Amino acid sequence: RRQRQMCIRDSRRIWCFDGDGAVIMHMGSMAIIGSKQPKNYIHVVFNNGAHDSVGGQPTVGLDIDLPGIARSVRYNAVHTVSDMNGLKKVLSDIRLEDGPVLLEVKVRKGNRKDLGRPTTTPIQNKEAFMGFLQDKELN
């Protein structure tokens, strides 16, 4: 069965949103991304130095150089921001850059008390995403 490689074959921008904990646990994926050089790939890492979504355990995210790691595995552009003005400027710059691009957004630990939770299961999300990709392949 032929697999669709959405970043390599698609002209649309692909945005991957990660936390620093996930990036650290799956760092090998950055090397694969760098080696494949997808021009439409933007990797946004929210770095708060913690596994916030699963209890707030500390990570080394704020102690290591994630942009330097991205450069060393051949990301074409890297950015770090820590405030809204910097984010707005970088987002306009990213639109003109070829990927892979890393955007590290340094954020505070914690979340809003009124933050909603997902209403669909992971399997439902997977099936909806697969259906979306199949629809796009037919067009």
Predicted regions and their residues:
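Short, small-residue-biased leader/transition segments that mark boundaries at the very start
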Residues: R1-I8
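Short secondary-structure boundary segments
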Residues: V45, S82, V105-V107
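Generic beta-sheet signal
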Residues: R12-C16, Y41, E97-V105
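Conserved thiamine diphosphate
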Residues: R13-D93
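Glycine/aspartate-rich loop-and-adjacent alpha/beta segment that forms the canonical ThDP
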Residues: E97-N139
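Short active-site-adjacent structural elements
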Residues: D52-V54, K89-V90, G110-G116
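Short, structured coil segments at secondary-structure junctions
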Residues: D10, Q37, V73-R74
